[in-house]
From Swiss-Prot:
GO terms for molecular function: adenine phosphoribosyltransferase activity. This is Adenine phosphoribosyltransferase. It is found in: Cytoplasm. One of its GO terms (biological process) is AMP salvage. Its EC number is 2.4.2.7. The keyword Cytoplasm applies. One of its GO terms (cellular component) is cytoplasm. Transmembrane segments: none annotated. The gene is apt.
């Protein structure tokens, strides 16, 4: 996937010391304020994935939804939601993951993932890769195969791609 950092960087708000001191937060919600930029993001992802064998798109709560939902409509593919623990009403598979300050848990409905389906996993940002790795494990435990991972932004200096080495990982914007 072609690096589009120079173009998209001007539309991504950078918030210092959020959510805690010393962290620079890349806020993609500013991209949503420019329909032509938001459309461009979805079209870039569509162009890259349209010809790949993908059966469904899975998205990580919550900003992954902003990319995955319009892309699934454009590609006419089912959308599978990965949510934080306790947010899904039917029977679920769950997967714990480590946070800086403890542990979290994500879940997916057991009947949302078809056996052996080829899945495109989407989140807004790749930092440590922990959430995406847990999401991929969760989807595979549910019977799917994660074929690709797409993130709008990748923080290359953190090297989250390292723990995702078993997957094809693509991003449009790369920050060092």
């Amino acid at each position: 996937m072609k690096n589009k950092t120079e173009y998209y960087d001007q539309f991504i708000a950078k918030v210092p010391d959020f959510p805690k001191k010393g962290v620079l937060f890349y806020d993609i919600t500013s991209v949503l304020l420019k329909p032509e930029v938001y459309t461009s993001l979805i079209n870039e992802a569509y162009s890259f994935y349209n010809l790949k064998k993908i059966d469904c798109i899975a998205v990580v709560e919550s900003r992954g939804y902003l990319i995955g939902a319009p892309l699934s409509l454009k590609m006419q593919l089912p959308l599978v939601l990965i949510r934080k623990e306790g947010k899904l009403p039917r029977e679920v598979f769950g997967e714990e993951y480590e946070l800086e300050y403890g542990f979290g848990k994500i879940e997916v409905h057991k009947d949302d993932v078809r056996m052996y389906s080829n899945i495109l996993l989407i989140d807004d940002i790749l930092a440590t890769g922990g959430t995406l790795k847990s999401s991929a494990i969760l989807l595979e435990r549910a019977g799917g195969r994660v074929k690709d991972i797409f993130c709008f932004i990748e923080l290359c200096g953190i090297n989250g791609r390292r723990i995702l080495e078993d997957y094809d990982v693509n991003s449009l914007v790369r920050y060092n």
